[in-house]
Amino acid sequence: MNKTRLFLSLLAACGAPALAQQAARFAPIPVMSIFRPVQPNGTADDALASGRVVPGLYAPAAHASKRWRIAFLFPHMKDPYWSGCAYGVISEARRLGVVADILPAAGYDDLKGQLQKMDEAIAAKYDAIVISPISMTANNNSIARARAAGIPVLELANDSRSDDLNLKVTTSLRAMGTEATRWVIRDAQQRGLKSINIALLPGPMGAGWVKGEVDGTRIAAQEAPLEVNILDIRYGDSERGLQSQLAGRILQRHGNRLDYIIGCTGCAPAALAPIRAAGYGDKIRVVAYDLTGEIAHLIRSKEIYAAADTKGVSQARVAINAAVNLLEGRGKEQPHTILIKLGMLDQQNAGSYPFDTSVAPDGYKVVLSHDPAKD
């Protein structure tokens, strides 16, 4: 761990507010801002294809003028991706001087729970709500209710087709799939393979990022200079035990023919033990659609070969800063969508990768709430 990351780890543990404001000030983040008009009821990738796209850097917002209260509705806290998002939210809440309450549901099969959290946030009269929707469309009515109550609603990471959102902060979810799959294709070419068989563990069906992963993989496969056969796609919640079962079923059907498995942040690590147990450790290579601290360690140890990186910490930083800027009335023209630029990690660049833009510091203990009045 380098000195900066060690300092951030110690800072998170002690929670000193004055020091936190210094340490948490992030470097400007490469983004694409997408301005209206955009395709109605579309995804972030639809906005990218239809809106006015302005590349740039997202700089840290100035300290808030008042103690704004912002609720963050996460789908769960069961994998390290959301721990990284929580770190980005809480560290920036300290720096900005605002209240942040993270209200997680119990998982991607807990839409009812997330809708209830939205009702609670509306009833509690938060100044803004930032939601990571479980569904592309099933959260739309609750988002509209919040807006009707006069509460701005922003989106973080998970995509939605709601036109009632004030702002989306995410990445090109389709690019998650294309970039991870293109890495697989380059690796296969370097190995001299003329065709490859792959299987996908993309996560829960119905989540916007899962569709993006699969669509992106299909696009990259169609454009590939070699034959790419997608033998199997197994959907399910990103809970580790379930994903290990799904990986086992893939191996039972296709293990002898399979070259690669591409999986989500909770899915890719879960495939490793079944692969080893089935005796395919030297045959099947695992690549991840996104990056967590766990996956970074597995890449360093050469158990996972590569990961696309949606930079969850950076997304969370931009989301809370954008919420504060919106509440403060800063800025002349509000974009429809802000896309954070993707990264790509493998064993070649792991020694120089800027992990502080993507994952929580080593040893970070998740905190779900911050109130500057209690510092």
Where are these regions (language model features)?
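Flexible loop/hinge segments that line or gate small-molecule binding clefts
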Residues: 136-175, 189, 197, 292-305
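Sec/Tat signal peptide C-region and signal peptidase I cleavage site
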Residues: 16-20
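Hinge/cleft segment of the Venus flytrap/periplasmic-binding protein
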Residues: 21-66, 202-205, 317-375
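Hydrophobic alpha-helical
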Residues: 124, 128-148, 217, 235-298
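Hydrophobic alpha-helical segments within soluble ligand-binding/sensing domains
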Residues: 114, 169-195, 212, 242-244, ...
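Extracytoplasmic "Venus flytrap"
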Residues: 38-59, 69-88, 92, 96, ...
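Flexible loop/turn connectors
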Residues: 280-348
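An alpha-beta-alpha
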Residues: 70, 89, 180-227, 231-233, ...
